[in-house]
Amino acid sequence: NSAIITHAGMSTNSSYKVDTIPPTEEGAGITGAVGAQNNFLNAGDTVDVSVTFSEVVLDTSSGSLTLKIAVGSDNETATINSGSTTDNLTFRYTIQAGDNDTNGISIDANDISGGTITDLAGNIASDVTLEAVTDNSSYKVDTAAPSVDNFTMSDTALKIGDNATVTFVFSEQICPETDSCAVEFTNSDITAPNGSLSTLATSDNTTWTGTFVPTDDVQLDDSNVLTLGTSYTDLAGNTGPTEQTANYEVDTREPTVSSIAITAQSGISSYNFLNPGDNVSFTVTFSEQVVVDNSSGLSLTILMGSDNRSAQYTSGSGNAQQVFGYTIDDLLTSGENDSDGLSTGSNPIVLPGGSTIKDLAGNSAIITHAGMST
């Protein structure tokens, strides 16, 4: 008898799929990084390159697949990191010391090498040549430490009322005080003896300025230097070097009168009397060396009995001791007589307009004094 061959048919059996088409590479790109800040990668950071295929693929190389990426002028090797059994293979490269790329990592046209890529059916991907990918500015590379090209003060001899502009010029941008940097550059990175430094300002993160204000009441000190520490970085996180300014001088203490005394006389008798024509010298000692401008006639008021007389300035500029001289006049013509002895009242130094007494830094002297007793 003839067979009846009609049948409802066999349903799909997923255990017996058929695929004779090899997988193809459809595109590549830089897709991520670990450790980057401000679009910069540093030594030890990693960057990932993903290659997309037309279907799910297998890495049969046991992890030896590689591709080349361009870091600056050098081609570096990225190694397979993940993606087998997906349609996207990810390759990873760890940034090395000495790598630099100011434009961003790119991918030159090159082949994936180091092993075989197949689809799940075993078809070998025969065309694994990547098309070139241009510089990606989100993945620039900087492993070089910044340098300090200039670190100066506008004034290195500071007196009362002075301040100085402090200027830093770096070889590249330095991390500002924002949330985008792990370490930020602030005025706390600078040690400033005998003074303080204001908040630093910049318009380009390369040139920074601040204002140094000296501390009040500092006796002359010329051993100071501003010191930049190493707690700052460039945008990539590279630590900068320490640096110092030239020495600067701070003197914010006014010279004061320490004493007034008679230090010389001529013609005095054995009984301690001065006669007409005799000369007497008064020495005013200051707390430090002072420079005297006597252009308007500096004088010292002395008491002759109950009368005031003026001893004229004679010498001492550049020293701590300033000398005033007076010549005794004839009693008959001037009535000069003092049986108790010469003295001065309080604040005896007369400083007319145009005359000055200043220390070597230029601070005006405080000339108040209790005076010299008889």
Segments the model singles out, each with a brief description of its role:
Residues 1-374:
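Non-catalytic beta-sheet/beta-sandwich ligand-binding modules that flank or precede catalytic cores
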